[in-house]
Design a protein with these regions (language model features):
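P-loop/Walker A NTP-binding module and the surrounding RecA-like catalytic core of P-loop NTPases
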Residues: 1-192
Length: 193
């Protein structure tokens, strides 16, 4: 889905707007996640906390919150297409420690039919407040994200439009629908009608 890259993009987004973000590597399932997030933090010039061989993500988050001196904390947690009970419990524990203001579900534009089940499970574990749709630069239209929003009651907040740190845009529903319909500028079209 591009979850770790999206965490780096969010950090870059907030830094460019005058805030001091920090990244916490709490994905203890994917071996390369720690290194990837550390590199992204370096590229975005933001604080980073992680423990390369950690096994308990909620403990990593707890220690990271004490170590980082930032305005915005962004946690890269584990994620999989199918959410098993173990991962739901893990995410719930991280959520309890973090007590986040925002909890984003990151989904690729091409997710399709599994979006509903994934959104329900993540919402149950963390209380989704927003959806970030990645890979909008592909041929996929992102309809699954709309299903996820309908299921969780959350709104799309951002869209990822490429692989670079700056390739994150605030969601604009008019542009989103225009892209889905293959219309480059729906607003102008509506004005003509």
């Amino acid at each position: 889905a591009g979850k770790t890259t999206t965490a780096g993009k969010l950090a870059d987004y907030y830094r460019k707007r005058g805030l001091k973000p920090g990244l916490i590597a709490a994905d203890t399932d994917r071996p390369a996640a720690y290194e990837q997030l550390e590199q992204l933090a370096d590229q975005a010039d933001v604080e980073f906390y992680g423990e390369p061989n950690a096994e308990n993500p909620s403990k990593v988050v707890e220690r990271g919150l004490k170590e980082l001196d930032v305005d915005v904390v962004i946690v890269d947690s584990a994620g999989r297409n199918s959410l098993d009970e173990e991962l739901k419990e893990e995410l719930s524990e991280v959520n309890d420690v973090l007590e986040p203001d925002q909890s984003y579900l990151v989904m690729p534009a091409d997710i399709g039919q599994s979006a509903r089940d994934q959104a329900e499970a993540f919402d149950e574990a963390t209380g989704i407040t927003g959806v970030i749709v990645t890979k909008m630069d592909s041929s996929a239209k992102g309809g699954g994200a709309l299903v996820a929003c309908s299921t969780s009651g959350a709104q799309v907040k951002f869209i990822g439009t490429g692989e670079q740190l700056g390739d994150l845009e605030v969601y604009d529903p008019v542009n989103y629908v225009s892209d889905m319909l293959g219309q480059p500028d729906l607003e102008s079209l509506l004005e003509k009608v």
